[in-house]
């Protein structure tokens, strides 16, 4: 009887230890970095896309896009450096996206995604982007006459560009030309 009781106790302890180890192994690491000084006067920013550790971060006020990218561990090798502005001043509670150079679908892509330049291309070129109508392409050209696009999220400030259009087109546009 004592032998059975000892075996049961050992089995229960083993199961408990396994449960703790298993729970620790499947818990993803935290993606947010919070410093005590940043929580008082910091910006809460979310970054996604071609970033090493996408997530929400609290960083110092006055932070630029490069500060946010650095806090998130940098970009992946597939990040399109022409689609973000390193000097852009982040806005509190802002959500930022780093688009890819190559398509991330299940197919192997050998050619970079053809992208339209929000700050330079004509309405006709912008209209060729799947997701942009003639009206939206003209609205983009009108918008940039008053202010250049400084981040991809600025597209949402254009009349006719909502969240759905932004999401469907953000990988197909850039802020600068490769020659710039």
Specify the residue positions occupied by each region the protein language model found:
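Ser/Thr/Pro/Gly-biased, low-complexity, turn-/loop-rich segments
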Residues: 1-159, 163-180
